Design a protein with these regions (language model features):
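HotDog/MaoC-like acyl-thioester-processing domains
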Residues: 2-14, 78-81, 119-169
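Short Pro/Gly-enriched beta-strand edge/turn motifs at strand-loop
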Residues: 15-22, 112, 126
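Active-site-proximal helix-loop elements at catalytic-domain edges
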Residues: 18-36
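A generic structural signal for short beta-strands and their flanking turns/coil linkers
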Residues: 33, 42-44, 109-113, 124, ...
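Catalytic strand-loop segment that frames the active site of acyl-thioester-processing enzymes
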Residues: 33-63
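Hydrophobic residues in beta-strands and at strand termini
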Residues: 48-50, 117, 164
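Compact, glycine-rich, soluble single-domain proteins
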Residues: 59-78
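Hydrophobic beta-strand-centered segment that forms part of the acyl-chain substrate-binding groove
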Residues: 77-127, 132
Length: 169
């Protein structure tokens, strides 16, 4: 009985972290907003560090709704892409090798994205986590929630529908 040789866990983690960093780095708007992602297994948590440039209403002050909406959409798209990349990396083969070289599948295209602003986004760091509700060959549905100090006090949530690309690399 021949079993495939298992890689050390640290090598697998480093390869996944490198792939995530390349994926995030390939999108200029993510860099513009300063959004970064923390990976724990296959789960991503997005972080948008506070910046004065994010303030939309200086009298409150409050984070601009456009920045909040963009943060939610970025988080949803990255979760959807990461679920695709994760699966391809786990399956191995040519797709996994292409990802290691920095070649990713095309990004899904947004069909619609509905944001619910539940409370004021305060002038502090924001966090978000998305969940892929359904991902098929042609269509995907993703829900995302954002919070600041307390994960139970969501300040915005969104649901997005995406047109899935051809997943071949």
């Amino acid at each position: 009985m021949n079993r495939p040789k298992l890689e050390p866990v640290q090598d697998v983690k480093q390869r996944r972290d490198a792939a995530l960093a390349q994926l995030v780095g390939s999108i200029p708007y993510i860099r513009h907003l300063g959004v970064n992602f923390d990976r724990r297994g296959d789960e991503l948590t997005a972080n948008m560090p506070f910046s004065e440039s994010l303030i939309g209403n200086p009298f409150l002050p409050a984070i601009h709704g456009g920045a909040t909406g963009a943060f939610l959409e970025i988080t949803a798209l990255m979760e959807l892409m990461w679920s695709i990349v994760w699966e391809q990396m786990e399956n191995g083969g040519p797709a996994a090798e292409a990802i290691e070289r920095g070649k990713f599948p095309a990004m899904p295209k947004t069909i619609d994205f509905t944001v619910d602003y539940l409370r004021t986004g305060l002038p502090r760091d924001a966090y978000a986590r998305a969940r892929v509700n359904r991902s098929g060959r042609r269509f995907a549905s993703v829900h995302v929630e954002a919070w600041q100090d307390n994960k139970t006090k969501i300040f915005a949530q969104a649901t997005g529908h995406f047109l899935m690309p051809d997943l071949s690399i």
